[in-house]
Amino acid sequence: MRSSGLTSDANQRGTIVTVLRILLAGLALAALAACSPAKAPQAPAGQTEIRFATDWRAQAEQGGFYQALATGEYAKRGLKVTILQGGPAVNVPQLLASGAVDLGMGSNSFIALNLAAEKAPVKAVAAFMQKDPQVLIAHPDQGIKSLADMKGRPILLADASVTAFWVWLKSKYGFTDDQVRKYNYSAAPFLADPKAIQQGYVTSEPYTIEKEGGFKPSVFLLADEGYPGYAAMVLAPDSLIAKDPKAVKAFIEASAAGWASYLNGDPRPGDALILKDNPEMTQALLDQARAKMKAYGLVEAGDAKTGGIGMMTDARWVDFFKIASSQGVFAKDLDVRKAYDLQFVSPKAP
């Protein structure tokens, strides 16, 4: 998922095409491997095993999944779930393609549409963040009052972001690729350069910068500036959707219950598993991240208010696709409905 971030849009899209062609080849190999007796350990009788890969190291932004595991929400629905944490070298679509995992976490809406564009048999089946938590962060004394003020300034970006929200920023605000600087997940370059701007999650990097730099940075949540993407999506292979839709539905229902509990109940069970998986995490960071998820409505705002946690709609996906395709990211004749499946999310009963 992570490339140099300094190439042209055409080269970026070419990289995506290459990766997804590898993904499709991997799916074919996975189908052959399914005939082999060398399978993963089976779940206990009456339980379905689900291996779920997250998109980053264990953190509060995955708290609902860990909470569902810790409080038995998956088990009570007949699932034996293993959470495999991600990281900078983890490619969730490739893990799905190889059969190494059953479900995966998609960071943003571009991922699902990229898969659809390459006819990869993987779909988004739920979105556990109605607002993408991505932010741009600036020093408070640089006269930056809006995203538009960042044009022409150096911006520290992760490789994956160059083919995601950066495309939207270039189109809407006229940003250019020569502004991009490599983001290595350290605040040090940002702190060393008062003119620098860096990406981050509203739940993480602003807190780290405040602690390490001793000042409160200016923070701009892209979702509040019109960026329409979902985040924290669950990706499912078409094969699993067809073979065991009940397991997919159970996973989504249990995860929604886990998120409700994590945000509005006692988060300690989920936090304990997060801290176990990621010893570099701290309780203070978890606490402030959870508070910000609630304050910004990342999980429970938008369609989740009426449809429940995890909700997705045709209208929201079509809106995102229209914006992306109008910017030349996707062909306008792409069938956006190949990117997602709404059968597992439905409005709450009145």
Regions found by a protein language model. Give the residues of each.
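C-terminal motif of bacterial Sec signal peptides marking the signal peptidase cleavage site
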Residues: 31-34
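Bacterial signal peptide processing site
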Residues: 36-38
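Periplasmic-binding protein-like
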Residues: 128-138, 214-244, 252, 290-296, ...
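Secondary-structure end/capping motifs
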Residues: 242-327
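Conserved C-terminal helix/tail region of periplasmic/extracytoplasmic solute-binding proteins
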Residues: 314-350
